[in-house]
Amino acid sequence: MASVPSRSALAFILLLISPVPLAQPLWAQTLLAQAALPREPYGQFLRVKVNTGERSRLTVKKNWLGKRRLNPTVPILVLAGHADSQRMGGAGTSGYAVAVKGAPPMQPGMTDEAFWNLKTAHRIAKLGRQRGLNIRFYDPGVRTIRNADDPRTNWSTGRRHVQAGGYALEIHYDAYGRDGIGSGVIPRVYGGQTVVDEHLAKEFGSFPYDFRGVLGAPRRGITMLEVGKLEGDLENKLRNPATRDGALNTLADRVVHTIAQALGVPKPFFQVPALPALPANRATARQQPSPPPRIPLPPVIN
């Protein structure tokens, strides 16, 4: 009767024939770790060139200066303008394509502005988190809330957020044609203007803080951003399924990049571990990683 190999010998044999080694030298572990790390954690998304049109013609009447600094980790709340005011006054612009060209709305029962406000605000929050911002998106979930003081509205939610020390930004698209003024920031009034407001104004343009006698959102501490008039290249790139995703990325990235600069948030990166130091070898012109240690042969089994 043949002798049965010991447990240690069997374990050693299994280790040798295993396709996945249970232990690897340090240099191999490091190379595998490097290969698993993404080369660029932010910015690897589709973009298309988007012309947001003219900047606010009221930029020359800017009567405010955003100087209040915010902590780089300040909680940021992104809101979609008119998301809670559909089928009522103040539902937002229909856009040139629907109002003038007779195109069907992007979603029945909702103005195109509200539709794009939702898409853009959501994308800003998504890319903002990738960029390292402490940011989230709020959707009231109910498209018609007639009581402005209802706790579910943008205004009520944004006000609570600001009172708790956060920063709130409501996304809008301006009216087309002569009714529109252009892209720009309508800064918050409650709480005072911040460096984020100032940076956004430099990027997009600005409105006076008391535009139309101080609007409801700024009065509650919520900054409003008009991305641009809902017409021309901007509207076309958003409506075209072939360019829509890239257009949303491009617009959202402009906002995210501007906020990150204002807050001084460094671009996130993944630290690539360095290879272990190798002893100097003057005999060779180029250093190579040490080969894996030789594994002794298993004991002979009688």
Whereabouts are the PLM-identified features?
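Catalytic-site microenvironment of enzymes
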Residues: 2-21, 25-302
